[in-house]
Curated annotation (Swiss-Prot):
Residues 49-61 have a biased composition (Low complexity). The lineage of its organism: Eukaryota, Metazoa, Chordata, Craniata, Vertebrata. This is 26S proteasome non-ATPase regulatory subunit 3. The keyword RNA-binding does not apply. GO terms for molecular function: enzyme regulator activity.
Length: 534
């Protein structure tokens, strides 16, 4: 047994590799099945990625087709609203269709418009052939929607002018959003020719929208002066026809046209010679008030400019039109500074206004402290932005306000100060300039002081009690007027029932007479009841 155990150990020692670096047998090669399986797995992974990509693309295409289908159905519904407005002579149905125009215009594409033009322009081949070259013909597949809104007798009937104008307006908006302004101009010119030959009250609301986008296309092409005579002609026609929406839109377009070329005198004449319709919607009112505010500000009527621009902000939409509110706030801040008032800091902290009003916040700080050096620094840094905003001319006028504020701050800080020190603090060229500015501030009532010309210093007078002046009374008057204006505008904005609603209702005197007769009749009945008993 011992011999067998030692033999086994010797056999095991021989089977072990030598410890000293002897050659080892190479490991067996991997099974070919494993290699094939890995290759198949890699190939399977690649095909899975391609399949996932194709699936995602197919899903995106399917969702886009569904969105296009919904858009076409919306356009079909809007056309029904227009037809209902024409047949029932109810303009509110037109308003309902136009109210959805911004939402519809964002979903327009070549496929939707191609299907809409083919589906609606069934009897008018000339207009269809004119519009289709501006669109790319889509690749038809079996899954494409067969859009046929007009079938049978309706397909051969002529399209209503309101519907035709609406569909062409969609084309203009799509081309304008695609920055194809030349092509949009051709369609818009053709649309204006068709509208000019029509005299239909149901078309007035659609035409007002067409006027706006027509002028917008020419503005993008920098040809606003070309379209001015056309807008004047349409304004005369709209006024004669008592078209309030057309009047409001065309007046605002003409004012925008004049202000674009800085023709403030012509704009002022247009405002004075025309009457803005009271029945116009709030958006047109907000635009009109902003344009008149710009005119008043240029003509040094700052109080009136502030009033109109405050009303413009009040008329503007609360949660949208952020760009419009930013533009109005920029001009309003400059006007308030020119009036010698400091805007509320909360204006600059609103999230939608904070970034755009940052240069004006720095400008306000410079004016508030009377720091002429900081004012010049802000002007140099943001001069191009102020010019783009159209406020640079007004901001240049603020230099005198900055100097006046600096003089007032110096007067409050020192009871007596030399003219040379004032010139140094205000960064003026000489003490003579400081003497002139201080004398003008005394004459305007900015400070209460006297100048000693011989010794060259300014002596401030004792401060008077502000409550003994008319300033508190004027401040209260301004606030009360503001509250009364809000009340009056709120009452005007309310909707009241028509006067015909009260025709069948009795007056107060008739009601009193009826109640008196009822009382007498009740007494007679009571006496009859008493007489019936023995």
């Amino acid at each position: 047994m011992k011999q067998e155990g030692s033999a086994r150990r010797r056999g095991a020692d021989k089977a072990k590799p030598p410890p000293g670096g002897g050659e080892q047998e190479p490991p067996p090669p991997p099974a070919p099945q494993d290699v094939e399986m890995k290759e198949e797995a890699a190939a399977g992974g690649g095909s899975t990625g391609e399949t996932a990509g194709k699936t995602a693309a197919a899903a995106a295409e399917h969702s886009q087709r569904e969105l296009d289908t919904v858009t076409l159905e919306d356009i079909k519904e809007h056309v029904k609203q227009l037809e209902k407005a024409v047949s029932g002579k109810e303009p509110r149905f037109v308003l309902r269709a136009l109210r959805m125009l911004p939402s519809t215009s964002r979903r327009l594409n070549h496929y939707v418009l191609y299907k809409a033009v083919h589906g609606f322009f069934t009897s008018n081949n000339a207009t269809r052939d004119f519009l289709l070259p501006f669109l790319e013909e889509p690749m038809d597949t079996e899954a494409d929607l067969q859009f046929r809104p007009r079938t049978g007798k309706a397909a051969s009937a002529p399209l209503l002018p309101e519907v035709e104008a609406y569909l062409q307006l969609l084309m203009v908006i799509f081309l304008m959003n695609s920055k194809r302004y030349k092509e949009a101009q051709k369609i818009s010119d053709d649309l204006m020719q068709k509208i000019s030959t029509q005299n239909r009250r149901a078309l007035d609301l659609v035409a007002a929208k067409c006027y706006y986008y027509h002028a917008r296309v020419y503005e993008f092409l920098d040809k606003l002066d070309v379209v001015r005579s056309f807008l004047h002609a349409r304004l005369r026609t709209a006024t004669l026809r008592h078209d309030t929406d057309g009047q409001a839109t065309l007046l605002n377009l003409l004012l925008r046209n004049y202000l674009h070329y800085s023709l403030y005198d012509q704009a002022e004449k247009l405002v004075s010679k025309s009457v803005f319709p009271e029945q116009a919607n709030n958006n047109e009112w907000a635009r009109y008030l902003y344009y008149t505010g710009r005119i008043k500000a240029i003509q040094l009527e700052y109080s009136e400019a502030r009033r109109t621009m405050t009303n413009a902000l009040r008329k503007a939409p609360q949660h949208t039109a952020v760009g419009f509110k930013q533009t109005v706030h920029k001009l309003l801040i400059v006007v308030e500074l020119l009036l010698g008032e400091i805007p509320d800091r909360l204006q600059f902290r609103q999230p939608s206004l904070k970034r755009s009003l940052m240069p004006y916040f720095l400008l306000t700080q410079a004016v508030r402290t009377g720091n002429l050096a900081k004012f010049n620094q802000v002007l140099d840094q943001f001069g191009e932005k102020f010019q783009a905003d159209g406020t640079y001319t007004l901001i240049i006028r603020l230099r005198h306000n900055v100097i006046k504020t600096g003089v007032r701050m110096i007067s409050l800080s020192y009871s007596r100060i030399s003219l040379a020190d004032i010139a140094q603090k205000l960064q003026l060229d000489s003490p003579e300039d400081a003497e002139f500015i201080v004398a003008k501030a005394i004459r305007d009532g900015v400070i209460e002081a006297s100048i000693n010309h011989e010794k060259g210093y300014v002596q401030s007078k004792e401060m008077i009690d502000i409550y003994s002046t008319r300033e508190p009374q004027l401040a209260f008057h301004q606030r009360i007027s503001f509250c009364l204006d809000i009340h009056n505008m709120s009452v005007k904005a309310m909707r009241f029932p028509p006067k015909s609603y009260n025709k069948d209702l009795e007056s107060a005197e008739e009601r009193r007479e009826r109640e008196q007769q009822d009382l007498e009749f009740a007494k007679e009945m009571a006496e009859d009841d008493d007489d019936s008993f023995p």
